[in-house]
UniProtKB/Swiss-Prot annotation:
Protein's name according to its UniProt entry: CTP synthase
Residue ranges of domain Glutamine amidotransferase type-1 in the record: 305-559
Gene behind the chain: URA7
GO cellular component: a single term: cytoplasm
Organism of origin: Eremothecium gossypii (strain ATCC 10895 / CBS 109.51 / FGSC 9923 / NRRL Y-1056) (Yeast)
E.C. no: 6.3.4.2
Lineage of the species this protein comes from: Eukaryota, Fungi, Dikarya, Ascomycota, Saccharomycotina
Pathway(s) the chain acts in: Pyrimidine metabolism; CTP biosynthesis via de novo pathway; CTP from UDP: step 2/2
MF-aspect GO terms: ATP binding; CTP synthase activity; identical protein binding
Length: 576
């Protein structure tokens, strides 16, 4: 097993996740099997109870793990399926060590950070790195380990020490370190001092970088590269220029041009790993498809505007998987994506009284967009604005996709304005509302006391109902009888309301195995009005877009019929 560690210095949020994912993708183009682990040095057990505005989105895995958003990057770039154990947090490791102490596994010894915690971290890395993550079912060849935060922070100290020990545990030929640093441009001059200081801190902790990935707003000058190499005690070929590009999907090719994989191949002796001809051919095909993808991005000029009506729009990372799913779909449709951010509460009548200009701008943005997306969320704030957005899409035949909460507000809107239930709402918004007004109800099996890990989580099947051959979303799924998607919710459509809703044209074309829990709704006689209780964005891949999102973008671009025809003729992974 080969290990490539990606750490960061100077500042957080520097792009370690994209660089780690891109490195893994390039290793896959050699035919290698690649996995990934993310270390998050916070005390939370997982990301499930953290505010999206605090930490970005919570990414959900097949096994129901609520993890850091970087695991989404790994899955999208590498085409793998990770587990909750691929996300290590300080809280998880401490819980693991304390559980062993309570069982007496340490035989009465004083339990300390070194060696007990650091050994637990190393054991975790070795165990999880060997878990098969792709369709081959075989143990991976290479594991990418991303250390979150910034080296030198007190929170990451135990993990840095564990990695220092780990390099000797696995051997030099099996361990490489890429350190990501910032090269700011001040008054037109590229400054190397922050990188020099970051590498000095790293070396003082016992870790030596094999490569330094320099993030900069512009391409690094040759003298800058030579200066970093000289003062950081590495060769110029070990300094990688990761400047800003038009799209993050260009980053793997940017690294390839600088022969990063050639260096890692020599450093880790990757040629010793025995690969079959089929593995190498698969890797070559992956690289060809990626080149084709980036070319399609550069040649996409026709714009499609999607209004994203959310309640966490002040931090775009709150909707990272949604953004990526839209990007994947727009690339398939050969369109240039423009996301129009609309804060849901700005659409509500109360905003007209408090800030008329903001209210008018929100409605102008919504009404001028080609398609409308209402993503997931929790709580009451902004939900009336989402309901109004769903109403606008329904009445004006604008392509609409609702996800999780987006399905619930679409159903409430339909109940209010088509069924005539004026006070229709959700028991999440108004717990004391009369039962005949509850369009959305709390799922009976869900724990109401504890918040962490108590939702309906992970990969679950959705069964398409009889007489749904007309359904656009079913056609997008290749007319399948069932699909499996990832869930994260506590509330569901009230089963007692379903018959009346369907009688008026709101069809629940997909349900769970019992046939009672509604998973997909679709409006009859509408260009594209679809909503899902599950989160399809979590399974969207760069080269294999999520079907509900693909339908939204294609409908918004007025190419849905031709897309469906192409998908039927060539297959779901065809380059349309």
């Amino acid at each position: 097993m080969k290990y490539v560690v990606v750490s960061g210095g100077v500042i957080s949020g520097i792009g370690k996740g994209v660089l780690a994912s891109s490195t893994g993708m390039l290793l896959k183009t050699l035919g290698l099997k690649v996995t990934s682990i993310k270390i998050d040095p916070y005390m939370n057990l997982d990301a499930g109870t953290m505010s999206p505005l605090e930490h970005g989105e919570c990414f959900v895995l097949n096994d129901g793990g609520e993890t850091d958003l970087d695991l989404g990057n790994y899955e999208r770039y590498l085409g793998v399926t990770l587990t909750k154990d691929h996300n290590i947090t300080t809280g998880k490791v401490y819980s693991h060590v304390m559980a062993k102490e309570r069982k007496g596994d340490y035989l009465g010894k004083t339990v300390q950070v070194v060696p007990h915690l650091t050994n637990a971290i190393q054991d975790w890395l070795e165990r999880v790195a060997r878990i098969p993550v792709d369709d081959s079912g075989m143990e991976p060849d290479v594991c990418i380990i991303e250390l979150g935060g910034t080296v030198g922070d007190i929170e990451s100290a135990p993990f840095v020490e564990a990695l220092r020990q780990f390099q000797f545990r696995v051997g030099r030929d099996n361990f490489a370190l890429i350190h990501v640093s910032l090269v700011p441009v001040i008054h037109g001059e590229q400054k190397t001092k922050p990188t020099q200081a970051a590498i000095k801190d790293l070396r003082s902790l016992g870790l030596t970088p094999d490569m330094i990935a320099c993030r900069c707003s512009e391409e690094l000058d040759k003298p800058t590269i030579e200066k970093i190499a000289m003062f950081c005690h590495v060769g110029p070929e070990q300094v990688v220029n990761v400047h800003d590009v038009a799209s993050t999907y260009h980053v793997p090719l940017l690294l390839l041009e600088q022969r990063m994989i050639d260096y890692l191949g020599q450093r880790l002796k990757l040629s010793d790993i025995k690969l079959g001809a089929e593995d190498k051919e698969r890797g070559a095909r992956l690289l060809d498809r990626w080149r084709h993808l980036t070319t399609a991005i550069d040649e996409s000029f026709e714009v499609v505007q999607i209004a994203l009506v959310g309640k966490y729009t002040h931090l775009k990372d709150s909707y990272l998987s949604v953004i990526k799913a839209l990007e994947h779909s727009s690339m398939r449709c050969k369109r240039k994506l423009e996301i129009v951010w609309v804060e849901a509460s700005d659409l509500e009548p109360e905003m007209s009284a408090s800030d008329k200009e903001k209210f008018q701008q929100a409605w102008k943005s919504l009404s001028s967009s080609d398609g409308i997306l209402v993503p997931g969320g929790f709580g009451t704030r902004g939900t009336e604005g989402m309901i109004l957005a769903a109403k606008w899409a329904r009445e004006n035949k604008i392509p609409y996709l609702g996800v999780c909460l987006g399905l619930q507000v679409a159903t409430i809107e339909f109940a209010r304005h088509v069924l005539g239930i004026a006070d229709a709402t959700s028991s999440e918004f108004y717990p004391e509302v009369a039962e005949d007004k509850q369009v959305v109800v709390y799922m009976p099996e869900i724990d109401k006391q504890n918040m962490g890990g108590t939702m309906r989580l992970g990969l679950r099947p959705t069964i398409f109902q009889e007489d749904t051959d007309w359904s656009i979303i079913r056609k997008l799924y290749g007319s399948a009888s069932s699909v499996e998607e990832r869930h994260r919710h506590r509330y569901e459509i009230n089963p007692k309301m379903v018959q009346k809703l369907e009688e008026h044209g709101l069809k629940f074309v997909g349900r769970d195995e019992t046939g009672t829990r509604c998973e997909i709704l679709e409006l009859v006689d509408h260009p594209y009005y679809v909503a899902t209780q599950y989160h399809p964005e979590y399974m969207s891949k760069v080269l294999d877009p999520s079907q509900p999102f693909l339908g939204l973008v294609a409908a918004a671009a007025n190419i849905l019929p031709s897309l469906l025809a192409a998908e039927r003729a060539v297959g779901a992974r065809a380059d349309f």
